[in-house]
């Protein structure tokens, strides 16, 4: 059997594919779309291309929270600007002290070492064993949600 060469993909292949499907849905199923779905499509199409790309990249990842410094996509020249545009248009939101209820999922994007560093900044944080698991450390952090999030905002 002769192996076929793998075609070179455009750096924006996922964006091109998404827009192809989106165009098809708009053409074939416009009458089935809700007002909120139509608004989403219009708002998405009004975003700059790089912001659309970043949104698609984030939407295809498993996690709910992401650290900006961990986002690297060669086809997106200014991730910070794209994040700001996505935030301004309501496509994403940034962690705030109001997210203390979600602290466990937010801390999941940090390493155990980073969680220890955040916890160590709190004077009244309880003592814990050095061999504590990250999961247990995150549980210890939950009652200090707002303070932990404030510390996170200082380092981000």
What are these regions (language model features)?
Residues 2-45, 53, 57-156:
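Basic helix-extension-helix modules of the SAP/HeH family
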């Amino acid at each position: 059997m002769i192996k076929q060469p793998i075609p070179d993909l455009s750096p924006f292949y996922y964006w091109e594919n998404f827009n192809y499907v989106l165009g098809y849905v708009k053409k074939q199923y416009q009458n089935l779309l809700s007002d909120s779905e139509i608004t989403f499509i219009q708002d998405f199409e009004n975003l700059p291309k790089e912001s659309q790309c970043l949104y698609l990249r984030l939407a295809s990842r498993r996690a709910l929270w992401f650290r900006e410094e961990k986002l690297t996509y060669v086809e997106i020249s200014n991730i910070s600007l794209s994040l700001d545009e996505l935030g301004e248009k309501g496509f994403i939101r940034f962690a705030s002290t109001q997210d203390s209820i979600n602290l466990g999922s937010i801390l999941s994007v940090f390493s155990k070492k980073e969680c220890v560093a955040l916890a160590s900044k709190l004077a009244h944080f309880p003592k814990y064993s050095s061999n504590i698991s990250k999961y247990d450390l995150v549980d210890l952090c939950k009652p200090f949600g707002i303070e932990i999030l404030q510390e996170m905002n200082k380092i981000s």
